Amino acid sequence: MNHSRSHALFAQAQTVLPGGVNSPVRAFKSVGGEPFFVARADGSYLFDVDGNRYIDYVGSWGPMIAGHNHPAVREAVERAIRDGLSFGAPCAAEVTMAETITGLVPSCEMVRMVNSGTEATLSAVRLARGATGRNRIIKFEGCYHGHGDSFLVKAGSGMLTLGVPTSPGVPAGLSELTATLSFNDFEGATALFDEIGPEVAAVIIEPVVGNANCIPPQAGYLQHLRTLCTRHGALLIFDEVMTGFRVALGGAQAHYGVTPDLSTFGKIIGGGMPVGAYGGRRDLMEQIAPAGPIYQAGTLSGNPVAMAAGLAMLELVQEPGFHMRLSEATSTLCEGLKDAARAAGIAVTTNQVGGMFGLFFTDDIVESYAQATACDITSFNRFFHAMLQRGVYLAPSAYEAGFMSSAHDATVIEATLAAARDAFADVAR
């Protein structure tokens, strides 16, 4: 493939953007090489500035569950912009969005719109601290909840990709308020609550870890956390920025049947636009200003164009059978990848929950951050580049989940598997 224009753009970008990108994982530092620059996207495909086409399993890191540039979403945006781009005042679309979310996610009796998943998690933790009068939070190794200071402790996503467990610039006094647990560690959770339970405002967790690749919870683990939080008076926060409306229409909490006190959302609810939200029990949400004393605000929150895009996307995912078909397509892909690896004599396993999946270069089951980081990263990096050269774009890090869309039909998946058979053969050489 020719990447001359992408190469030139990356060189230019590095003179004006730190590392040449606006989010670290995009720079390909984990896998090596240079990123391609996207010119446009449609359906299951990305097209770069050099005219190359890629089957895309990143999906803008999750929002593109119905494929890129879906006509219904695009047309909704086009209609909305005729009336203005931003009002800084209430509009009907944000009410409809809140009603849609509360209708699909019963644990959310009220919702506050924000502009990103990071804003949502920061705001949810502030609410938890204000509501409980406590300061400490518990998170999990490898889980990523945005770039808020409290969360950059043993974090996943770009932090894990770059091998940085904490970030310079985070005050020690603040990071000391964040306790960490191993994901799927029942005994560790019980012991930590026995030690610091009266100080804990909230437990925040990705119910399916998507930022240390894709790691589902063991049976009963989320309910175990629910029980501990209730017993000790702490709030349980599900970060459903990735899983919300993807692993099931009602998110991971519907899929696993566990009810959190607060939930955070993003990605799909923006349809590709910058949107986040947090919601939960009415008695908690009514403590947010102006209804209550806990302050949170945003100039662009509830932006009418973003609301239009998100509402159109949420309408698409409510079509009968949408999530069943998405899960079946993801299963077909995962089974095909394992078969292709096995034929090449390469140790590979996969994890999948609905339309999320993870590919691990190991024979072992992966159920924790430690197991994810023990996989063969060198082989993953070789596989990534072999697939990219064959026109298939996977997440440029061994520590990021993959995402299926409804635009990935049987033909696209078979083309992916054909590329994988050749790519695994390359890795085996």
From Swiss-Prot:
N6-(pyridoxal phosphate)lysine carried by residues = 267
User: Which GO cellular component terms are attached?
Assistant: cytoplasm
The protein's UniProt keywords, in alphabetical order, are: Cytoplasm, Isomerase, Porphyrin biosynthesis, Pyridoxal phosphate
Gene3D superfamilies according to UniProt: Aspartate Aminotransferase, domain 1 (3.90.1150.10), Type I PLP-dependent aspartate aminotransferase-like (Major domain) (3.40.640.10)
UniProt pathway annotation: Porphyrin-containing compound metabolism; protoporphyrin-IX biosynthesis; 5-aminolevulinate from L-glutamyl-tRNA(Glu): step 2/2
Q: Which InterPro entries match?
A: 4pyrrol_synth_GluAld_NH2Trfase (IPR004639), Aminotrans_3 (IPR005814), Aminotrans_3_PPA_site (IPR049704), PyrdxlP-dep_Trfase (IPR015424), PyrdxlP-dep_Trfase_major (IPR015421), PyrdxlP-dep_Trfase_small (IPR015422)
Instruction: Name the Enzyme Commission number(s) assigned to this protein.
Output: 5.4.3.8
Which GO molecular function terms does the record list?
Answer: glutamate-1-semialdehyde 2,1-aminomutase activity; pyridoxal phosphate binding; transaminase activity
Query: Where does this protein reside within or beyond the cell?
Result: Cytoplasm
Enzyme class, first EC level, given as a word: isomerase
Could you say which cofactors this protein requires? pyridoxal 5'-phosphate
A Gene Ontology biological process noted in the UniProt record is: protoporphyrinogen IX biosynthetic process
Q: Which reaction is the catalytic activity of this chain? A: (S)-4-amino-5-oxopentanoate = 5-aminolevulinate
Q: Which family does it belong to?
A: Belongs to the class-III pyridoxal-phosphate-dependent aminotransferase family. HemL subfamily.
Please give the HAMAP family that the UniProt record associates with this protein: HemL_aminotrans_3 (MF_00375)
How the protein assembles, per its UniProt entry?
A: Homodimer.
Protein name, per record: Glutamate-1-semialdehyde 2,1-aminomutase
Q: Which organism is it from?
A: Xanthomonas oryzae pv. oryzae (strain PXO99A)
